[in-house]
UniProtKB/Swiss-Prot annotation:
PANTHER family: ATP-DEPENDENT CLP PROTEASE ATP-BINDING SUBUNIT CLPX-LIKE, MITOCHONDRIAL, ATP-DEPENDENT CLP PROTEASE ATP-BINDING SUBUNIT CLPX-LIKE, MITOCHONDRIAL-RELATED. One of its GO terms (molecular function) is ATP-dependent protein folding chaperone. This is ATP-dependent Clp protease ATP-binding subunit ClpX. InterPro entries: AAA+_ATPase, ATP-dep_Clp_protease_ClpX, ATPase_AAA_core, Clp_ATPase_C, Clp_protease_ATP-bd_su_ClpX, ClpX_bact, P-loop_NTPase, Znf_CppX_C4. The lineage of its organism: Bacteria, Pseudomonadati, Chlamydiota, Chlamydiia, Chlamydiales.
Amino acid sequence: MNKKNLTICSFCGRSEKDVEKLIAGPSVYICDYCIKLCSGILDKKPTSTPSSGTPTETTPQHSDLQVLTPKEIKKHIDKYVVGQERAKKTIAVAVYNHYKRIRALLNNKHVSYGKSNVLLLGPTGSGKTLIAKTLAKILDVPFTIADATTLTEAGYVGEDVENIVLRLLQAADYNVARAERGIIYIDEIDKIGRTTANVSITRDVSGEGVQQALLKIIEGTTANVPPKGGRKHPNQEYIRVNTENILFIVGGAFVNLDKIIAKRLGKTTIGFSDDLGDFSQEDRDHLLTKVETEDLIAFGMIPEFVGRFNCIVNCEELSLDELVAILTEPTNAIVKQYIELFSEENVKLIFEKDALYAIAKKAKLAKTGARALGMILENLLRDLMFEIPSDPTVEAIRIQEDTILENKAPVIIRRTPEAIA
């Protein structure tokens, strides 16, 4: 046969004599060797390139999406978050339903229920952010935190809401499919209420605009995300991210929301003080468990925004016992961390029980909840951490109550000369 009359593969140039099969298409041919090669390439999962900001398009399968039961979710949260039993149970159920919904969608099943976005109420340092972080760690999904006070509506100087999605995409190493089932936590959400007290009229207007802008990505939209962040401009390339299955958790202190609830319920009919300013913390926590959509609207959130959160739960102010437990019980408890740091220097760090309660009392007075604990301990132990590495005679350090309350020096136990030798 004349070589010129032989049919060849359009990709590799092999002739029909050199291959087992040659499949014809419109004016083209492909051999079995090239088909196998292409099949192998398609079977490989694409790798992301975060440094260049190039998105990957891997489609997630149900097999790599963890869907733990509510009890399992709460059990994991308990390892890191002290107290907040009601909040942890409520969130565990909401998160379970959310990811169960995603798994059903991945399996091409019809789903009639919507996503379970969560709104967390509660004072600073009550564990709102920690709960969200822990959830992301448990579920092994991308996670990012945003501050609502830095966001602005279009036309204002500040950060566009799409940049929140960009940060989630970056947390997912630009894997779009992973980002599309991640978790976004927006803190200080109460600060963008349109009628909140002590805020300028300009900020109220801007706050409502931010709520409107957030509404779109929270309810589910295809966001055009600038790969490098910043403001959008014409002729710019975008990464398209569908936010329909991203779990949004928002949190805020919502100061004085309890008074709005009391006014709705009728303060004299629910067993509280006649003076709205006289509520104890226990009263406030109890009132916040009765929050309704109308209370949040009265606070300054727009109805459409509140309507996107079908799970609204209160994180209570931490008690003295809970603050002590936070110091010592969680897997990553801060006292455990300092004990380990000192043990690296071959020094035993001992906290007496009264000292732990003194630290908790000091944190309580700071009005910032668990956040104050780390600062108190850092200030307490900083000088010791400076001196200890240069002093091999120190065997143990005992922190007592008067060390905290009266600024007395901790008890230092020294090694004998023989032990040092």
